[in-house]
Structure formats: structure tokens, C-alpha cells
Regions:
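A short alpha-helical cap/connector motif
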Residues: 1-129, 136-157, 161-211
Length: 211
């Protein structure tokens, strides 16, 4: 997105909460791969979608620093909860300290481990909303594991589905992340178990509704 247009958008939407500003700022100082953080625009979108869907339980695959996790928690009703899964155990203390900064941190349950192994332990149909934002090579596996856990009429959001525009470029066979995104997009397009639409926001977000 052009910088001037992005500045205009960010100045005409709800402000980024101070806690999230701090989490974003600290991550840029202390960590690598900070492009994985949702950021102001996408964060406000996630909160808005959560308030529209009004879920009781949210499942997030890929916590990273907890930014998007807190956006979901912020959008929940009083008794709602977010279950978030992070595979990198070295991030656990860092994430917990970030979640503790927010008044919504008590709505979040952090699971450390491989999502493909953790998700089957949840009851089928027990989540209203899920967010997939983890290893791109495994997107289809995450989706297949998650779909049974979503109630009928529930939603799955999938991040990065336009992947820096690489989805319309020639892709090297060695680019496994892009191949994973392409595989997910192609298979989802013909999956009649769900309704789906890709939003060209940031790096692409696919909104999926379970029939």
C-alpha cells in the first residue's frame, strides 16, 4: 500500500491502543520477523470482525508476540475466551508478559506446541471463530484440523493469502511458503463445505464461513 494512502487510512480509523503500540514497538527492538505482527489496520479489522461475529470461543494458530491475540480478546463479549497456539517455546515468557500488559489478558489461554497435534484435543464444534497465521507450508493441514472444531455458521480467517503478491508471479519450486499458500488457495476455492472471500487488506485475509 502506498505510504500516503496508508497514512490516510490509519488517520481515519480507530486509534491503535497504547498497549498494542508498546508491544509492536518492543518487538521491533527485540525480535526478528516483525512483519508477522498484524499492526494497526489489520488489528482494528480483527477486533471489528470479532464484534460482528460475537464469538464465545476463538482459536488462534500462530501467536507470535500476542498482538492479534489481544485484538480478538478486545472484541469479545464478557465471557468470551481466546485459545492461542504458539509452536516456539522460546517465545512463551515473552508472550505471557505481553498479554499481562492488557486488561484483556485474562481472556486468553496460551498453548505452546504444534497446532496440528494440539487442535484435535479440542471438542468438535466448540469454536465460533478461528484465525490461521502460522507456517505457510502447513496452511491446508491447519485448515483441515480446524474446520471440524468450528460450529456450523462459524468463521475461519486466514492471513497472508496474497503473500506479497507472489500468488500471481512465477514461483520457484524451492519457495515452499508460497507453494503452501498457492496450494491452500487453490484447494479452498473448490471446497463446497465453506463459503469464502479474499479481502485485499495488507497481505490478504481470506474470510471463510462454514456451511
Amino acid at each position: 500500500m502506498e505510504s500516503k494512502l496508508e497514512e490516510y487510512i490509519l488517520s481515519h480509523i480507530d486509534a491503535e491502543p497504547d498497549v498494542l503500540k508498546k508491544i509492536d514497538r518492543d518487538a521491533h527492538v527485540k525480535l526478528l520477523h516483525t512483519s508477522m505482527i498484524s499492526g494497526h489496520l489489520q488489528g482494528r479489522l480483527l477486533r471489528m470482525l470479532t464484534r460482528m461475529i460475537r464469538p464465545e470461543r476463538v482459536l488462534e494458530i500462530g501467536t507470535f508476540v500476542g498482538y492479534s491475540t489481544l485484538c480478538f480478546a478486545e472484541g469479545l463479549e464478557e465471557n468470551g475466551e481466546v485459545h492461542t497456539i504458539e509452536i516456539d517455546d522460546e517465545l512463551e515468557d515473552y508472550v505471557r508478559s505481553n498479554l499481562a500488559l492488557s486488561e484483556y489478558g485474562n481472556k486468553i489461554k496460551l498453548h505452546i506446541g504444534d497446532a496440528v497435534q494440539i487442535i484435535p484435543g479440542f471438542e468438535d464444534g466448540s469454536f465460533d471463530l478461528a484465525f490461521i497465521d502460522a507456517d505457510k507450508e502447513l496452511y491446508w493441514e491447519y485448515f483441515e484440523a480446524t474446520l471440524p472444531k468450528i460450529r456450523k455458521g462459524g468463521f475461519i480467517l486466514v492471513d497472508n493469502t496474497l503473500w506479497y503478491g507472489k500468488v500471481v508471479e512465477k514461483v520457484e519450486s524451492s519457495d515452499r511458503a508460497t507453494q503452501g499458500i498457492l496450494n491452500f488457495n487453490e484447494r479452498l476455492a473448490y471446497d463446497d463445505r465453506v463459503e469464502k472471500v479474499i479481502l485485499p487488506i495488507r497481505d490478504g485475509i481470506t474470510v471463510i464461513r462454514k456451511k
